[in-house]
Amino acid sequence: GEVPLTCMELSKGEEKKQLIFLQRHHNHGAPSRPPHMIEHRANIRALFDAGCEGVMAVCSVGAIPEDFPPGKVALADQYIDFTGHQSTFHDDAALFTSVTDPFDSELNAALEAVLRTAQDFDAKERMRYTYWLAQGPHFETKAEIDAIDTLGGHMVGMTMPREVKLARELNLPYAAVCISSNWAAGREPGNASQDLDHHSVSSQANRRLAPVWACMLHLLTM
């Protein structure tokens, strides 16, 4: 189907840059599309066909380690996807894409510097984490989060790795800015039985957009 893109042109003196915004949960005016129903192939292909030179994804995640509290904004440098969901443009021909390092190193380095400055973090602050892809649309159980922690996941979400796989197939540089919007199930300090609420999660993410804007503005000057 059609993919709605918002195109903007920013200028500074004689220099002009174009920014294309895509809401991954777009649903043609209806309520947001649930994560397991997002048409990732259409979204990434639309960005590629629009001539994007790179992608800065913004993700709301549930955090597992103590050094990634709600409100902190960091980066993904690896992902783990055991969902069994296929994300590829190559359904007919056997083509195999390397994702040893799935995220663009140049973009991540630039964004890490911006995020440190925007949040007053020193050089010791950890800024890169492993994203665990959950099937969704349900949040995880405490037992699932414990297992994810054991297997090396630091944050959980329901979308992003499906995008970066497709971007890699198109050689489209991709970075993921991740907003810790909540503690993952069972990790709320002092209340391991705290229920997760979608609206509270979204509200926390929306309150932490300033570092995200700083990243975007920096990329437009690169």
Segments from the language model and where they lie:
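Metabolite-binding pocket within alpha/beta catalytic cores that recognizes anionic/polar moieties
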Residues: 1-99
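Non-catalytic positions within long, well-ordered alpha-helices that form the structural scaffold/packing
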Residues: 48-51, 149, 168
